[in-house]
């Protein structure tokens, strides 16, 4: 009742507040702190209410970054520097980096345009193989390691079985049937499969959730709002930045003034991963959809950051296809679960349409909404397909670390990642 008075009479906020308390009543005890604190605090912030820590515990989630010295790991470190919910407590990497200060290890190989934050320079790197040591210090971990796929798969399961949730940027578990592969604006409901995964792993807190490949993060969001209107055939040609290979022009000078028409395994991921994203949960696993066919061609181009896709799509026979104007309106008005929850990293507008004939462009659009928006343009009718258009997204933000942070926010907001009741948290119970 106090909460309802605080948030006032705006029905959308008032109704959400009531639903959260109802959900909390039916939640396991260890999730109550998370749900009541983070989701309800968010509503109070919307109303600009100062509550100073007396009413609500303001403790942040303790986070680890596994693979912290690589390009994606560095991006995680930057994104989490001042995150309102997450605080980095552990930086983990390979044994050869373990025991050294993070600043010393990344000196000369810091790939970000922004300088290394002071707060990380003196943090001592932990060996990622020391699972218990890492897991005991954090509420969950992000994982972005450079290892063989079977080694990554085993390492992530070890963390999950140590009751440490893993939000992974890696591809190793993307097709594990009970591991959700999530774009929060598209298939947030797939996180429900975590309950089944925990049964298989024998865990109470631990699980693995993954983000999808960076190549499809531009065109799948644009296709998704139209899928229910009957889109059943897609051709996508992607033009992918060198940072997707973990490279810069300094480390890969061969890419200057060059195009490479091959990226190993990328076309298979681009064709198959959307089918799982658009799939459904059945008998304890995610079953891929069979109502859409995708073919893709992926090309490496001399761009630092930002993946572009040229997309062709057709609708089912007998279906009245929407007009260009209707499609643009659908794109511009689309909101997903991330926008409904107003997650910290979520773009206010997911899909931005540009009417200029020479947009979207990498330089002007890749950092739109902190690099988390998807830009679309040049929608027109096609001679072989029904429509064609161009889209782009930032591959290391929306397509990698930023997408994983957004997924973690979703998992926290929905109660799947909870604060551990360590000794310093017990007083706030």
What would you call each of these model-derived segments?
Residues 45, 51-261, 293, 368, ...:
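N-terminal Rossmann-like NAD(P) cofactor-binding subdomain of oxidoreductases
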Residues 243-423:
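Charged docking surfaces used in two-component/phosphorelay signaling
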Residues 20, 27, 31-39, 48-49:
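Short terminal hydrophobic/aromatic SLiMs and anchors at protein ends
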Residues 5, 14-19, 25, 41:
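Basic polycationic patches enriched in arginine
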Residues 4-5, 82, 228, 276:
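Solvent-exposed polar/charged
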Residues 26, 31, 66, 427-428:
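Short stretches within intrinsically disordered, low-complexity N-terminal or propeptide regions
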């Amino acid at each position: 009742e106090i909460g309802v008075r605080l948030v006032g009479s705006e029905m959308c906020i008032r109704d959400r507040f009531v639903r959260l308390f109802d959900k909390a009543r039916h939640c396991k005890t260890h999730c109550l702190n998370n749900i009541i604190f983070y989701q309800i605090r968010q509503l109070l912030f919307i109303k600009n209410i100062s509550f100073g820590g007396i009413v609500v515990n303001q403790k942040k989630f303790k986070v680890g970054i596994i693979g912290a010295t690589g390009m994606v790991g560095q991006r995680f470190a930057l994104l989490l520097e001042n995150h309102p919910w997450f605080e980095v407590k552990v930086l983990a990497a390979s044994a050869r980096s373990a025991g050294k200060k993070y600043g010393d290890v990344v000196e000369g190989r810091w790939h970000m345009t922004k300088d290394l934050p002071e707060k990380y320079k003196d943090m001592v790197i932990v060996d990622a193989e020391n699972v218990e040591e890492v897991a005991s210090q954090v509420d969950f971990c992000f994982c972005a390691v450079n290892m063989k796929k079977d080694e990554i798969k085993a390492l992530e399961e070890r963390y999950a079985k140590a009751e440490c949730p893993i939000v992974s940027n890696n591809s190793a578990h993307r097709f594990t049937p009970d591991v959700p592969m999530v774009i929060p604006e598209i298939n947030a409901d797939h996180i429900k499969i975590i309950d089944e995964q925990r049964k298989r792993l024998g865990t109470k807190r631990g699980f693995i959730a993954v983000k999808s490949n960076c190549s499809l993060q531009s065109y799948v969001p644009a296709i998704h709002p139209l899928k229910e209107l009957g889109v059943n055939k897609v051709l996508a040609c992607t033009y992918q930045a060198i940072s997707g290979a973990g490279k810069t022009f300094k480390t890969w000078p061969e890419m200057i003034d060059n195009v490479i028409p091959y990226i190993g395994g990328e076309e298979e991921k681009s064709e198959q991963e959307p089918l799982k994203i658009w799939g459904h949960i059945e008998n304890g696993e995610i079953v891929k959809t069979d109502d859409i066919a995708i073919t893709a061609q992926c090309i490496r181009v001399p761009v630092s950051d930002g993946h572009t896709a040229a997309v062709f799509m057709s609708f089912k026979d007998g279906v009245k296809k929407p007009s260009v104007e209707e499609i643009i309106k659908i794109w511009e008005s689309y909101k997903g679960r991330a926008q409904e929850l107003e997650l910290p990293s979520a773009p206010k507008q997911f899909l931005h349409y540009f009417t200029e004939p020479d947009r979207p462009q990498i330089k002007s659009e890749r950092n739109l909404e902190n690099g988390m928006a998807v830009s679309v343009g040049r929608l027109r009718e096609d001679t072989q397909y029904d429509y064609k258009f161009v889209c782009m997204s930032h591959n290391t933000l929306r397509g990698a670390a930023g997408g994983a942070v957004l997924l973690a926010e979703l998992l926290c907001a929905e109660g799947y990642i909870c604060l551990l009741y360590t000794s310093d948290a017990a007083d706030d119970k």
